[in-house]
């Protein structure tokens, strides 16, 4: 005798938590590389962000009368906190990451109704607010540890984050100024300054050639390579789709190489741009957010290309050296329109004008 049961009759182990866990795992190599080049600060920031995220998720669950496990089990809050922690300078004051996580989870996620309801990428909302509100703290990137006379120890890292000075009394800006020829900004600032202020062809060529080497010496090339490898793993495991990162990187690369070709004097800038800043981070781990990105196959290509175009415009012609966060948020606004006009044709219907 057969037993009648209700649908669904097929089940999948691809739960939300599994997807989030894969994404977190794919970010860990970049986390380790960032620690290798920039010190213990990244681990402290990540621990602080994740701990606060857990507290916020529990508090929201209590306020809404839900079981605590209901909000913690999907790991979305932890992923948001980790993304934000890896996006800010490792030795930013503790209150920077605290404000960022609160804004990302409370205002950008739970105010809209929680996971799946938010219109904008929560981590990028938090990051953009921090960048606009606290530009000094958000641009205080230490040079790689190998370039520092006295790299911060674990005790120094805690002291810098919670007391703004090392155990010997040096601030982040003093550590930055102690290294000749190295500024607190990334290689993107150097590219922008070189293109805008140097007119001599020989000098410009030499400086822009040096930028590509700075990407590797400064650690940004290795960090982006780690994000690239992690992103390729996610595509292989079908955790994310290939359309968004390929369209984003392809559009940006095409425009960057075209700019280099037209300028005639710019060499290596496109390569340096692709492997510096948050380019690979944004392409594989931020723009691919399944809630705030386009959901149709054609829409993913359009969305990714739009993000790549906006990053190009901001980096080459805007005031900010990176621009990934603002590009993703601006593209999020266009998602409903993109999805509306890229819906695939229903099986059995004819191509024609949309009614």
UniProtKB/Swiss-Prot annotation:
Cellular compartments annotated: Cell inner membrane
Database matches in InterPro entries: NqrB/RnfD, RnfD_bac
Residue numbers of FMN phosphoryl threonine PTMs: 186
GO cellular component, one term: plasma membrane
Chief location: membrane
Cell membrane listed as a keyword: yes
EC category: translocase
GO biological process, one term: transmembrane transport
Ranges that cross the membrane: 15-35, 36-56, 66-86, 87-107, 128-148, 215-235, 239-259, 275-295, 297-317, 318-338
A Pfam short name: NQR2_RnfD_RnfE
UniProt entry tagged with the keyword tRNA processing: no
Bilayer disposition of the protein: Multi-pass membrane protein
Cofactor dependency: FMN
Domain of life: Bacteria
Annotated keywords: Cell inner membrane, Cell membrane, Electron transport, Flavoprotein, FMN, Membrane, Phosphoprotein, Translocase, Transmembrane, Transmembrane helix, Transport
Catalytic activity, EC: 7.-.-.-
Biological function: Part of a membrane-bound complex that couples electron transfer with translocation of ions across the membrane.
Complexes and interactors: The complex is composed of six subunits: RnfA, RnfB, RnfC, RnfD, RnfE and RnfG.
PANTHER family membership: ELECTRON TRANSPORT COMPLEX PROTEIN RNFD (PTHR30578), ION-TRANSLOCATING OXIDOREDUCTASE COMPLEX SUBUNIT D (PTHR30578:SF0)
Protein family membership: Belongs to the NqrB/RnfD family.
Protein name: Ion-translocating oxidoreductase complex subunit D
Source species of the chain: Glaesserella parasuis serovar 5 (strain SH0165)
Phylogenetic classification of the source organism: Bacteria, Pseudomonadati, Pseudomonadota, Gammaproteobacteria, Pasteurellales
């Amino acid at each position: 005798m057969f037993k009648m049961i209700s649908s669904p009759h097929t089940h999948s182990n691809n739960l939300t938590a599994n997807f989030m866990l894969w994404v977190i795992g794919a970010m860990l190599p970049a986390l380790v590389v960032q620690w290798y080049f920039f010190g213990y600060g990244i681990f402290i920031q990540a621990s602080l962000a994740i701990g606060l995220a857990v507290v916020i998720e529990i508090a929201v669950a209590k306020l809404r009368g839900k079981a605590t496990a209901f909000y913690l089990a999907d790991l979305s809050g932890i992923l948001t906190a980790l993304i934000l922690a890896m996006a800010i300078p490792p030795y930013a004051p503790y209150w920077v990451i605290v404000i960022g996580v609160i804004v990302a989870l409370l205002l950008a996620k739970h105010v809209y109704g929680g996971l799946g309801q938010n219109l904008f990428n929560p981590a990028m909302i938090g990051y953009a607010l921090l960048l606009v509100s606290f530009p000094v703290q958000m641009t205080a990137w230490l040079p790689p540890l190998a370039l520092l006379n006295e790299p911060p120890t674990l005790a120094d890292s805690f002291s810098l984050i919670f007391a703004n000075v090392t155990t010997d009394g040096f601030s982040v800006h003093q550590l930055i100024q102690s290294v000749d020829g190295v500024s607190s900004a990334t290689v993107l600032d150097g590219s922008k300054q070189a293109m805008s202020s140097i007119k001599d062809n020989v000098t410009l060529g030499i400086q822009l050639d040096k930028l590509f080497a700075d990407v590797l010496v400064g650690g940004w090339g290795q960090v982006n390579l780690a994000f690239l490898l992690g992103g390729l793993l996610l595509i292989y495991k079908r955790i994310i789709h290939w359309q968004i990162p390929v369209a984003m990187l392809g559009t940006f690369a095409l425009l960057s190489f075209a700019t280099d070709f037209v300028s005639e004097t710019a060499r290596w800038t496109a390569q340096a741009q692709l492997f510096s800043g948050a380019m690979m981070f944004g392409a594989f781990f931020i723009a691919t957010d399944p809630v705030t990105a386009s959901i149709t196959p054609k829409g993913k290509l359009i969305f990714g290309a739009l993000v790549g175009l906006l990053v190009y415009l901001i980096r080459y012609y805007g005031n900010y050296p990176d621009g990934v966060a603002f590009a993703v948020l601006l593209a999020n606004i266009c998602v409903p329109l993109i999805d509306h006009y890229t819906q695939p044709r229903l099986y059995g219907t004819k191509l024609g004008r949309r009614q």
